[in-house]
């Protein structure tokens, strides 16, 4: 969640973290879905993409390379959805990985 906060991205829902069946009605409100653990949420993400046109990212943000790719995928989806502003997260990636 900290990574998303750093990128000024508001989390709609974390499923199943404390979720209920009622929370499921809010899932289509998200712009895209994050599936950091494919074995848990990939089938749901595929369903939401097929039925609601919601893209998903299934990269696990662990390690420098995968975290950078995870952020680049977020940037791609955000830029596809927001037409009046373009986001560039490369400076953030550089800042987070410069001294590693």
Curated annotation (Swiss-Prot):
The biological process GO terms on file are: light-independent chlorophyll biosynthetic process; photosynthesis
Q: What top-tier enzyme class does this entry carry?
A: oxidoreductase
InterPro entries named in the record: ChlB/BchB/BchZ, Nase/OxRdtase_comp1
On the tree of life, the source organism's domain of life is Eukaryota
Task: State the UniProt keywords alphabetically.
Answer: 4Fe-4S, ATP-binding, Chlorophyll biosynthesis, Chloroplast, Iron, Iron-sulfur, Metal-binding, Nucleotide-binding, Oxidoreductase, Photosynthesis, Plastid
Query: A GO molecular function for this record?
Result: oxidoreductase activity
The note on cofactor binding and number reads:
Binds 1 [4Fe-4S] cluster per heterodimer. The cluster is bound at the heterodimer interface by residues from both subunits.
Which family would the database say this protein is a member of? Belongs to the ChlB/BchB/BchZ family.
What PANTHER family does the database record attribute to this sequence? Answer: LIGHT-INDEPENDENT PROTOCHLOROPHYLLIDE REDUCTASE SUBUNIT B
| The protein, known as | Light-independent protochlorophyllide reductase subunit B
* Organism per entry: Pleurozium schreberi
Gene for this protein?
chlB
